[in-house]
């Protein structure tokens, strides 16, 4: 069994981002990410602060917009349109969840696809499914980077994705399919889940239930990717996989914390730099 170290891999990605940001600045382009936070949700504030800190450490300018809980949908859309038109902004991120009176889909669809560094816009989703070049959601993109870092080729593998969210499950399945894995997506209505998982060479657990994947669901030598971050009543953080029981059976496994989690912000930075490079290319400043 080998641990897939997300901390080490994310540090490598951030170093690459910093180097690319420096090159862009030398060419007269300052990469910039606009982050919009509506309301005062504590978890969202923590995530936003982590993203800001990561931007600053990597040479990306972070532009923060904190809006009150009472902000109307039209006010939020108006701000997004201003940022769309601002040529100095490369990426726009709206921290989710949004207050109940705001339609999330309308908000995400208002962000221009070329600035949609979260990869949630329908155009980017369509490009991913079609195997075209676009922005990909950060968590599944980070998982693919970890697999690549450890020399794991998914082509021909039987892969099972547990969970069908738009943020992780569906894009993860598309990425694996594009990489020539044979993919099964399972969810709350799936029958014979244990049987399906037991035949998998690769399992990606993204269901949001602590210790959901048990040893009897995993075959010997399987690769196990744990996307879950669940806090137990005793304060411990655990994933969707029963790590202690599953790890001895697996060939590779991601821990929680320190596995997939660190990769999400790293790939957000990577997507932002990619957008900035596109801006520089469009301006004729760089050729690649």
Swiss-Prot record:
Reactions catalysed: (6R)-5,10-methylene-5,6,7,8-tetrahydrofolate + NADP(+) = (6R)-5,10-methenyltetrahydrofolate + NADPH; (6R)-5,10-methenyltetrahydrofolate + H2O = (6R)-10-formyltetrahydrofolate + H(+)
Residues involved in NADP(+) binding: 163-165, 188, 229
Pathway where this protein functions: One-carbon metabolism; tetrahydrofolate interconversion
Record's keyword terms, sorted: Amino-acid biosynthesis, Histidine biosynthesis, Hydrolase, Methionine biosynthesis, Multifunctional enzyme, NADP, One-carbon metabolism, Oxidoreductase, Purine biosynthesis
EC number(s) from the headed UniProt entry: 1.5.1.5, 3.5.4.9
Gene3D superfamilies in the record: Leucine Dehydrogenase, chain A, domain 1, NAD(P)-binding Rossmann-like Domain
GO cellular component terms listed in the entry, alphabetical order: cytosol
Annotated GO biological process: L-histidine biosynthetic process; methionine biosynthetic process; purine nucleotide biosynthetic process; tetrahydrofolate interconversion
GO molecular function, one term: methenyltetrahydrofolate cyclohydrolase activity
Subunit structure: Homodimer.
Family in the record: Belongs to the tetrahydrofolate dehydrogenase/cyclohydrolase family.
NCBIfam families: PRK10792.1, PRK14186.1, PRK14191.1
Protein role: Catalyzes the oxidation of 5,10-methylenetetrahydrofolate to 5,10-methenyltetrahydrofolate and then the hydrolysis of 5,10-methenyltetrahydrofolate to 10-formyltetrahydrofolate.
PANTHER family: C-1-TETRAHYDROFOLATE SYNTHASE, CYTOPLASMIC, C-1-TETRAHYDROFOLATE SYNTHASE, CYTOPLASMIC-RELATED
Protein name: Bifunctional protein FolD
Provenance organism: Campylobacter curvus (strain 525.92)
Originating gene: folD
